[in-house]
Amino acid sequence: MSKRAYFGTDGIRGQANKHPMTAEVALRVGLAAGKLFRSQDERRHLVVIGKDTRLSGYMIEPALVAGLTSVGLDVRLFGPLPTPAVAMMTRSMRADLGIMISASHNSFADNGIKLFGPDGYKLSDAQELGIEALMDQGLQEGLAAPRELGRVKRIDDAQARYVEIVKATFPRHLNLSGLRIVIDCANGAAYKVAPTALYELGAEVITLGVSPDGTNINEECGSTHPEAMAKMVREYRADIGIALDGDADRLVICDEKGVVVDGDQIMAIIAAASHKAGTLKGGGVVATVMSNLGLERQLNTMGLSLERTAVGDRYVMQRMREGGFNVGGEQSGHLILSDFSTTGDGLIAALQVLAVMVETDKPMSALGRQFEPVPQLLENVRFVGGKPLEAAAVKEAIADGEAQLNGAGRIVVRASGTEPLIRIMAEGDDPALVKKVVKSIASAVKAA
């Protein structure tokens, strides 16, 4: 089996109570994962589960638990916890599998299931396909005997454990005393842990998006709506604003003037500081095809390279592991610092930026513009069915655009892994030409 029926680029994701994000599919994931582990050896296996604050988490979590325990796996429940924390706890608790129930930056109506291996890394494509192969078996197959059913326990101090891990990534000789920080937790998984970590490191903390009600996650707040954070930074005259997304694996920052700093600039800040300190590994940074050409040029001036991958933090992490890199990420704010974490961690990345601020005694406005971005335009075109990228007219429009840019820019056209969208991105030194190229390709996609 090579074609994915359930898993996309970031686990299983969709609208709650619609295929594939139903209680039945969650039950089948639990059953299939359990059967896969039991087929490998007969010992007791342990699975840990975390979730964000979506209402549908109350439906998905017990369905997963039912599937796992019915085939004899033990389960530990964390409750609301960031995705990177679940990855860390999977490893520290010697679990065989970690599961995060979240649709990240999507609205509350969506949910998702992400799987982590015992090393804290996202499962490989082959491992996910192995689970998929067992998901369509009958629900009565391979069940455990009554005495062999799994047991379930809640871990009450999971949030406190993660706070301590996060604080340990901040240099011991520094603290955040004297800094006024706005933190927007998107009414999501970090609503307790992020303000706590910043406060315990000495900051004056002003909170936003810390009142989840099950339906307000990412709603006009968080990393996808940084204007809320920026407004509060200006109002309270804060030194910096930090916005996380619903599962806290994504980070956007703004400076003391409310100017937003994206993932590319944050990578440049951390890479430059690490390079200066002699701690940058791999001779550069790993990012995706969507990262700005300006980042690549900036790194080149320091004698560093930018390695590009397909879109998706799993592919960034994969390249980082292959090449021995320790800084990578996406323009959208997924930032992976592999010295500290096995996946994107917004809070840890924010602390490393704060460390640079404190160490250099510079305001965020002096750090946030590491390079001048090359004009870049992104347009999303929704499609109903078919494969528009295979249409001859679309291929012709892309080739024509590349010819017009003539090596002084880039074009990336791809299908979203999580939504029925074609994402069209072009960048180059001539903004008018970039706009013309994007509009031409978008028109071809719409007509396909």
From Swiss-Prot:
Transmembrane annotation, as ranges: none
Cofactor binding, per record: Binds 1 Mg(2+) ion per subunit.
Listed EC numbers: 5.4.2.10
Protein modification: Activated by phosphorylation.
Reaction(s) this enzyme catalyzes, per UniProt: alpha-D-glucosamine 1-phosphate = D-glucosamine 6-phosphate
SUPFAM superfamilies attached to this UniProt entry: Phosphoglucomutase, C-terminal domain (SSF55957), Phosphoglucomutase, first 3 domains (SSF53738)
Annotated positions of the Phosphoserine modification: S104
InterPro entries registered for this protein in UniProt: A-D-PHexomutase_a/b/a-I, A-D-PHexomutase_a/b/a-I/II/III, A-D-PHexomutase_a/b/a-II, A-D-PHexomutase_a/b/a-III, A-D-PHexomutase_C, A-D-PHexomutase_C_sf, Alpha-D-phosphohexomutase_SF, GlmM_bact
PANTHER family: PHOSPHOGLUCOMUTASE (ALPHA-D-GLUCOSE-1,6-BISPHOSPHATE-DEPENDENT) (PTHR42946:SF1), PHOSPHOHEXOSE MUTASE (PTHR42946)
Membership in a protein family: Belongs to the phosphohexose mutase family.
Designated name of the protein: Phosphoglucosamine mutase
Organism: Caulobacter vibrioides (strain NA1000 / CB15N)
The organism's taxonomic lineage, starting at the top: Bacteria, Pseudomonadati, Pseudomonadota, Alphaproteobacteria, Caulobacterales
